């Protein structure tokens, strides 16, 4: 993953780099929204963006070691979320109301910058997906999503698809129930949902239009519960969505925090293998029904 705010950091944003988590943006590169001079595509490249370079090296290593078994994919954050890091999240949300033209100008730049970086990975044969955490209805309204976030998700996806000939999947954090149909309308082939979304309801609303992924709670279950409780959570996800018309795969609701017990990860994987085997049989009785 490229990181939510790797581009703002590359453009001069101040950050901290803790030992136990990813880099955290603490001050955006743009201090005055009427001065966007730092938004220069000449400063967007693999040499200056250490996060992109490190991710590329890691993907190359993964492909060499396990590339015959799994697909190695890079995730680039969508323009809406990245733009929020250019000026700061609070200021960006204010701009959606008071300065929408400037907000759009920033997202235009981010669209070009993110695709410029993505091309390095595409040219080397890696798949590219996207995510848009700040586009969550836990942060913005469905109307704002449709007006500001969705058009740039579509634009970025079209750029990638034009290169690969394949549609993209997307992840959006938080509550997304009210925009499920919008995400499907955007043309995404798959949708990774956070644990706030009910998989059974998502299946009924858009299961015939998108491949669904989800959505074991990464903190409340994976980090805080026992292996037995993790196993039950995995089974519950399968129980709700195993027969989704366009397909289903188990997934965490979002990124796992540092320090998740190894036993919980193993319980997740082992239970998922059993459930996926049952799912493939497509028989009326499954392990999650007991």
How should each PLM-predicted stretch be described?
Residues 3-4, 26-38:
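A short glycine/small-residue-enriched secondary-structure motif
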Residues 3-20:
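Glycine-rich loop at the start of a catalytic domain that most often binds anionic cofactors/ligands
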Residues 1-4, 75:
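Acidic/polar N-terminal loop/beta-strand segments that form early-domain functional surfaces
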Residues 15-31, 42-290:
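Active-site loop segments of alpha/beta catalytic cores
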